[in-house]
Amino acid sequence: MHIGLFYNAYCTESLSKIVSIGTAVPAYCHQQMDILQFMQQVYAATEADKRKMRFLYHQSGIEQRYSVIPDYSKEIQDWKFYPQSESLEPFPTLELRMTMYSKHAPLLSVDAIRDCLNHAHHPKNITHLITVSCTGMSAPGLDLQVMELMDLKKSIFRTSVNFMGCYAAVHALKIADAICKAEKKAQVLIVCTELCTLHFQRENTIDNITASLLFGDGSAAVLMTADDNELPGLHLDNFYSEVIPKGKRDMAWELSSSGFIMTLSGYIPELIEQDFSGILQRALAKENSDFDDVTDWCIHPGGKRILEAIHKSLQFANGQLSYSYEVLKEFGNLSSASILFVLKKMLYTKKEMRKLVGAAFGPGLTVETFTAHC
């Protein structure tokens, strides 16, 4: 995007707003305890391993997750993605995983977009398209596939936010905010689609076990316009991003021949507990606000321990992160789509939010925040 677009956007007092959010999940809903049984076959060599995994799954705060893969609650003879062998060999390759991504991600994206537009907004009126994903990529990519399936204008402005991880939705909102401020008639469509369950790995490591108990598949779409559009919505006030360098090795996402490899250390909740409060103070200071002004919290449900760390960091009373806990319980961690699932729940159940703070975390360790009101 041209630097002048951002300069012009942030030299104005106008706001952008979210006018609609849609979500979609794949067909296969797996109970957390069914996934546990599958993963015990993968990781548990001994009864002690099984007991440890059972404890972790029971403590996860997750009841179910969705996947494009049916195998996680099927008997071995009914597996479709993994080899029907106790050794799981030959283990699915990166090529097979990307084939599955290319098959399912565009269709799931379209389901979320249709839920977002909900017959009230015509696809031909969309001027800008931003696709977000860290679980698959190709060229031509998700942006062109969505454009074709939704019959969007061939001249549409499009861009992609790739491989940024769980905070990428906030980054996309920031890009859309700049567009809407610079172009008053813009209608910006964001779609975040993550097929995390394609990338579960074979090696018995704590990172792989943690990823296998946390992540699910899902898609979320957002329609944004300039503030003077007549449609009601959530007005976006400000954005703030900060990196915690000491956590750069504690959360990572890398390519390998067998898929994408997750690094997710147990130190992350401690880092967030130590640093999150200060980051939010600096974010709120941009608009001369403080914690007392905040009425609502939209926090990425990265995991139960992360939400507990935020509770401690901000000295919350019980219930202030209830929407985040609900999304974690119903869907697991959906990477970039998660925070939009939380925001949708809030928008559809709360009539007024005088000061909302949203935050998501990802590799870096990066914290992306935004403030909003309606």
Residue ranges, per PLM feature:
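Short, well-ordered amphipathic alpha-helical segments that serve as non-catalytic structural scaffolds
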Residues: 58, 62, 104-118, 175, ...
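Conserved beta-ketoacyl condensing-enzyme motif
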Residues: 56, 60-152, 291-307
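Glycine/charged-rich beta-loop-alpha catalytic/anionic-binding loops adjacent to active sites
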Residues: 92-93, 124-128, 149-162, 202-207, ...
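Acidic-glycine-rich active-site phosphate/pyrophosphate-binding loop
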Residues: 137-152, 190-201, 249-253, 307-321
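Short coil/turn connectors at secondary-structure junctions
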Residues: 13-16, 123-127, 154-157, 183-188, ...
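Claisen-condensing/thiolase-fold acyl-transfer catalytic domains that form or cleave C-C bonds
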Residues: 2, 10, 110, 134-135, ...
